[in-house]
Amino acid sequence: MKYITIIPARGGSKRFPGKNTHALNGSPLICHSIEYSLDNPNIVGTYVSTDADDIKRISSAAGAEIIDRPAEFAGDHATTASAMKHAVQYLIDKGVEFDYVVLLQATNPLRPKHLLDEAIGIIEKGENDSLFTVNRSEKKLGKIIDGKFVPWNYKFGMRSQDMEPLYYENGLLYITRKELLLQEIIEGPTAYPMVVEHPFGEVDIDTVEDFHYAEYMINQYKDE
């Protein structure tokens, strides 16, 4: 199997302008994902899909190849799946050979060193058309109905360790067959939920405060 990485990174963040090129621990945010991909020998190509000139320049200097993302796939209402479909079709039209795409989100810059190797190992077994990473949630969740809180995954007074396990997508990485991405599907019918038991799974950058937290985590777990 041949694996490539695509990192989608549009330039129009409204909550945090310039987020993808903002320095995290001395390196532009997007470069953390580029370097993670380039460091893995299983990856035969690392691409950044973007509409922003500054992201193109920084990503190219970091060693990634650039896919120009049209405006129709870069607006506020454009989905990651539509951008990935465009990128995959672009590469196919160029004659690039690959079977699976590793999707790395620039806003999830911290990943355990061996996570991608382990994920590819799961895909190589041939039982799953895709894979995505999840964290276990320890939160007691519920709904507010008619002014009253109604527990959803627990009962009042229940200990956290007695709750039924629930999980959420952490965005660290996705692996998907190219045929699914051409249908704008990232998680296919046999997608494997890979549980991440590492604090990096909690880092998702959307605000300045998230950057501060990520820098703390880098220094706290720099050897992992």
PLM feature spans:
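Short active-site oxyanion
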Residues: 42-47, 200-202
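Short, high-confidence coil segments that cap the C-terminus of an alpha-helix
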Residues: 43, 96-98, 127-128
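A generic structural signal for short hydrophobic patches within well-formed alpha-helices
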Residues: 56, 178-182, 211
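Conserved core of the sugar-phosphate nucleotidyltransferase
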Residues: 82, 109-199
